[in-house]
Amino acid sequence: MSFLNSWRAVKYTNKPKEEDIKLPNSASNLPTTVQACVIQFISSLVSPVHPQLLSPEELAKAFQNFYKHTDEFIASTLIPQPSSKDQNVPLLFPEEIDAQKKARQHLLNQKDEWMDQIEDIVCEYLYDRIFCLSTSTDAAKDDLLKKFIASEEKKELINCIPIPDDEKLTNRLHEVSEAFFALDEQHTPRSKINTFMTVNSSILNASQLPQEELNADSLLNLTIYCILCYPGFHLISHLNFVLRFRNADFLSGEQRYCLTTFEAALTFILRACPNLLTQSSIQPSDDPLSLEVANSETVSTSNSLHDPSAEPYPVNRSSLSNLRNLGLALEKSYASLLSKVANHTAKSSEDSSNSVEFVGDPPLERFLTVSDASDLKIGEIELLLSDYKRLARLLFEKNGNQ
């Protein structure tokens, strides 16, 4: 069975041939050997030779392995390696050595451009099959988010978000949320992540906060509000698409920071309404986003593709320094929201304040004690999000008892 077919056919008589896969004209810029690698990868995913559909995690690993192996292939076969000192090579003039260094650097830059182009070609070719995967819960979560935004409980959540009470600010955030519609027309991870980055930047500009008040704490609150203003659909699917299929080695620290902020905001919103969760196919114990790719640390080889115990692909740890700042900022946001919960639920019953105390210490205390931000693992953000989920449930459970 094909990995990417959302339907289950009874007969598979015609196996697609690699020569039947036509790449776009833009692929002509790639070396012929690289084009062959791209066609072979696409064929491996659409050919009916596999026993079952790939899970989102397995498919993400397949893409990341493909990116990794293609990058290594280009580097080893198309880029001349620097000569070893032990090799017998003719002496060169300084000008010749400098020219060789420049030529090699040009090829390295060209390799990165090729890798971006390869990602675009593969993801756009397979977009209808890999966006909002049938083996994932993306569609159910998108529907849950849409229902929440259309419900009255959205207003209750907005009232608990610590943002300035400024009508002009909220109007600007409504306008910023319109930028999310561009995601529906974009079919590559690069284009989608650029939209998320644009929205993130626009939120900062719309806040018009003084520089000393412009931090990740206020950004998270404004991001939550901006998402609640978005009347569209598939926002979770768009975010998961980026996290699954964007080349992990090409994600900058700023981009990871941006994606983590949207992940935290969406997770908080999805956990804010237990009533809707009980009416959906998603159980309250489920991870709302299941962004497994963002929590990965190591990569499996192609031979371990079907092994569920295999380690996922690597994260560039050097680009995670911004997560420490995010942890510090979310720490303050957590305390602020907890205070609002306590004030909100105190009117409910005499023992409501005791119910708030079980939340315990602020999230991810070790974020404040780590000496080197490069020691942080992006998977640790799950612990922070779980505290937000618990806090959101507490807020609306108490609100429902009033």
From Swiss-Prot:
Its main location: cytoplasm. It comes from the Eukaryota. GO terms for molecular function: GTPase activator activity; guanyl-nucleotide exchange factor activity; small GTPase binding. It is found in: Cytoplasm. GO terms for biological process: vesicle-mediated transport. The keyword Phosphoprotein applies. Keywords: Cytoplasm, GTPase activation, Phosphoprotein. The modification Phosphoserine is found at S355. InterPro entries: VPS9, Vps9-like, VPS9_dom_sf. Residues 139-278 form the VPS9 domain. One of its GO terms (cellular component) is cytosol. This is Vacuolar protein sorting-associated protein 9b. The gene is vps902.
